[in-house]
Amino acid sequence: MRIFRFTSISPRILPSNHYSTFPLKQNVSSLSPAKYIAGALQEHINSPAPKAGKKIHADIIKTGFQPDLNISIKLLILHLKCGCLSYARQVFDELPKPTLSAYNYMISGYLKHGLVKELLLLVQRMSYSGEKADGYTLSMVLKASNSRGSTMILPRSLCRLVHARIIKCDVELDDVLITALVDTYVKSGKLESARTVFETMKDENVVCCTSMISGYMNQGFVEDAEEIFNTTKVKDIVVYNAMVEGFSRSGETAKRSVDMYISMQRAGFHPNISTFASVIGACSVLTSHEVGQQVHAQIMKSGVYTHIKMGSSLLDMYAKCGGINDARRVFDQMQEKNVFSWTSMIDGYGKNGNPEEALELFTRMKEFRIEPNYVTFLGALSACSHSGLVDKGYEIFESMQRDYSMKPKMEHYACIVDLMGRAGDLNKAFEFARAMPERPDSDIWAALLSSCNLHGNVELASIAASELFKLNADKRPGAYLALSNVYASNDKWDNVSKIREVMKRRRISKTIGRSWTSED
């Protein structure tokens, strides 16, 4: 269906006084119909409620008015602002020869709604038509490649292809295009390429600086991130947040996250939700209950305390610092809770030796019609394991697929093996592992071996260890020690000697004080 035609008919004066406030501001008699319509459309485009402007389009169709290019572009913009992509595309397709601006408006509309496939097809059509893409067009292609909502699999080399097109077509590298290039290279893990583009900036760009800092921090290049931060002349809250968040991820640098948090306030910047969430994460890594309480007090004064992200971060921090009562107090005071809040509290109870409270909360969660996620089930199953509730744990495991259509992952199977094994049902745990729909991974056999070590079952320990060593013999040094302990507890000293000889030959040593399930 054609919305309007670009055929030659005499324009009729539009009999409308409801288009906008435009007629009240202009002497309508002095305007041509085209200027009148263009002005009315612009009024609606600029208004917070642009949908009323669609009446103008309806009148254009009814009267047979021939819109010029200016009106057509404004109709395109109007429909995009209203979120009506199909109408916008119809207007676009009616253009005899779409201009660069028309292409860019339509492409930006697709980008805004996450329609990456449609965006790329339109860019392809643009190229075939002979219309040259400008920096803005290419920046939108780059942004589309970073779109999280897209299900389309894009080539990893897309950024390099766009970059090559920029160079080949001699497109000017303005701030928008440089920012898009740097951000895309960073998100694809190509930091050297990102840095090369970053160095071409004539003027400092705080957005690019932040992208580079985040990219370096994500890959553990802390010194490079610091270099960018220190050479950034005009810093803002976002740059500081990138440093606070980056430092917070590792136990080696978490203390520096707190230091940066203090420094930014001395520099005159007030923490926002992102800042608080990152520094709370640092307190969790440091298990620093005291510092966490101080940050909590500041959050209370800041006005962001009621935000659901703050509540979830705080209760998770308190739980990891061993302050489970403080965590529960935060949980109870939260005005709004989501699945992450409930999961953090359940997991916190389980890890702090309160399995009964964890399971009670898991039951209450369902009463509030909050659907558990995979991590929630892990917390509940772990609580059952520590309480010895085999039947309850298996019921929860079965409910994953039965009630929530969630296919259990390896971690959930490992929890059940651990649950049965801890309770002494070693044969049942072994049969459960063998009956799994997928091949058991190393965590499954490690859980069974741990239980065999606990109960001194030599036969199953040998089987579990054998399967475990087939998968990653050198990455489970504690497994050798566990098997050796089982043999020793059953006076099988020859086997103990053989195990130690294998460890010596493979240069495998057990680090004192680490869990046997940990990986080097």
Swiss-Prot record:
It is found in: Mitochondrion. Pfam families: E_motif, PPR, PPR_2. Signal peptide: none annotated. Its main location: mitochondrion. InterPro entries: E_motif, Pentatricopeptide_rpt, PPR_At4g14850-like_plant, TPR-like_helical_dom_sf. One of its GO terms (biological process) is RNA modification. This is Pentatricopeptide repeat-containing protein At1g28690, mitochondrial. It comes from Arabidopsis thaliana. Residues 444-520 are annotated as: Type E motif. Keywords: Mitochondrion, Repeat, Transit peptide. The gene is PCMP-E34. Residues 1-19 form a transit peptide. One of its GO terms (molecular function) is RNA binding. PPR repeats lie at residues 68-98, 99-133, 134-168, 174-208, 209-235, 236-271, 272-306, 307-337, 338-372, 373-403, 409-439.
